[in-house]
Amino acid sequence: MIPLANGFRVSFMHGLDRLSPVIRKLKIPVILLGGGLQASLPYRSGIKRPQDESVKAFIGAIIDKSGSVGVRGEWTQDYLKQLCFNDVDVIGCPSMFMFGDKLNVQKKTPAIDADSRITINITSRITEMGPIVESHTAKYPNLSYIGQEMDALRLLLWGEGIRKMKDPNPIPVWPSHPLVRDGKTKLWVDPWPWIDYLRGTDFTFGTRIHGNIAALLAGTPAFVLGHDTRTTELARYFEIPNKLISEITPETDAAELYAEADYGPLNANHKKRYDTFIGYVERHGLSHVFQPGEDPTLFEKKVASIRYPDSVALYSGSAYQRYSRRTKRRVAKTIRKTRKRLHI
């Protein structure tokens, strides 16, 4: 089973090229579970893309083993059909079915106000989020930012910002940012405490698809700001409230997004989408915890019995001290190498 969320992209061509010959040599079935095209918006059908040949070889190898492939949304399905593959099923992303056919997202408060508990998720390279972060940091004192990138982890562990992005920056990529400096940046290495935290919040929004899915799994309203085909097609397939990042202005407010969001279609059609997903899984001979005779609550009970680490946090002073020591070691190492080369 191969889950490739955004594997059909230029930067992963080498990965596909390595996988294709391996798959062809296998003597067992190979199943693609939720593959996706990553491309800029608006999605354009029928154009030639640099990764086409790599994708053709990869999908051809899988279909020879399993007969069909499962993809995240209709744009990816259309893309593969343009490459002459017709055995393509739209099944969404497995993460949305963590709790099977049960999903119940309800608004916990009539409206969002200054006292609301809001979380924001951000893709650091999406600069359009800068003004949104600034305005919401000022307006909502209970706002927190949940990091999901390695850059965010380095920031919390070492106080190390993204060098190619200026400091100060409206996006929380440096220790000087108020959301980082004031301890409002969080990051979990396990999904369960992350989801538990989101159960205690009122609203989540931003550009990270799984940051928003984590909230939905917690029963908390979420709103996706789509910035590429991968995030947008998935939000549309699952009927998660969403807008394109191009539709967002510096004045866009979480309260407005919350007010316009309708979670009725998301909830009402979840069972149908679950049946589609499970039908694909069973058609390919995979067993699963939701089938007759299995008890999915056993796993949930085991998860509940585990004490997970708290979120990674930037503790005042200590991260800077670690980063300082790390930097000094790097400088000392560079000086030693330079002296050795110069025979000093």
Residue spans for each PLM region:
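Active-site anion-handling motifs in enzyme catalytic cores
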Residues: 1-344
